Regions:
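Exposed, low-structure sequence patches enriched in small/polar residues
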Residues: 1-222
Length: 222
């Protein structure tokens, strides 16, 4: 028979986004008077001085506690105190992304994500029934949060795309090309077998270059 059973779920979220409303800078717009094919790209070149930023963080904690009543001891007159059974999980996820259209032809994107675990001592977290254990848990959690938790998984990605301004050059206005670069990095913590034995971590790294080109022969011969 169950004497008492408690389940507690906590979740806290925070998100921040910054999107700049800054007019792009065109350094050559007024310097170059002519607007022929060779100066058109320079006059249209615009620099964005600030990127857009997004940050998200979430903390999730689950605590379950159950206490069983000793019916056998009550019947025989010999009480047998059954220990409390409990389980707990405390996680902290963080994500960051940056998007920067540095020029009207060059776009840069960076994103990263971390899954961390908040370290908790294996004690009954009950302020009334176990005040010493609760204080130990509280101090340990504060320290783990100050250390940003124990990272379990980390991912990051970097992308850059450049639209080559070939169509603005008179002799190449029949072509269109773009160059892109993509790099990813992944890290996973290895499993912990015991206090003294840990499996190795897993790291993955990948890079990729892409070049795409289109040729418009109708524009070439017309």
């Amino acid at each position: 028979e169950t004497e008492y059973e408690t389940t507690k779920d906590y979740r806290a979220n925070f998100a921040y986004s910054y999107v700049p409303y800054v007019k792009p800078i065109k350094p050559f717009d007024k310097l170059l008077k002519k607007n022929n094919g060779y100066t058109r790209y320079a006059k249209q070149l615009a620099f964005n001085v600030a990127p857009s930023i997004n940050f998200q963080t979430a903390m999730m904690r689950n605590y379950y506690e159950i206490k069983l009543r000793d019916l056998t001891g009550a019947a025989t007159g010999v009480p047998n105190d059954i220990p409390v059974t409990f389980s707990q999980n405390f996680y902290w996820d963080r994500a960051f992304s940056l998007n920067w259209a540095f020029t009207n032809n060059l776009n840069i994107t960076f994103s990263s994500g971390t899954n961390a675990r908040i370290e908790e001592p294996y004690v009954q977290v009950n302020k009334e029934l176990n005040p010493d254990g609760y204080q130990l848990w509280k101090d340990s959690v504060k320290k783990s949060i100050a250390d940003l938790g124990t990272p379990m998984k980390y991912d990051q990605q970097f992308m850059a795309t450049w639209q080559l301004p070939l169509q603005l050059i008179p002799v190449l206005d029949w072509t269109n090309a773009s160059l892109s670069y993509n790099a990813t990095y992944n890290w996973d913590r290895g499993a912990t077998v015991s206090e003294d034995i840990e499996m190795g971590n897993t790291i993955k790294n990948q890079r990729q270059f892409d070049l795409q080109a289109n040729l418009n022969l109708l524009s070439l011969y017309n």
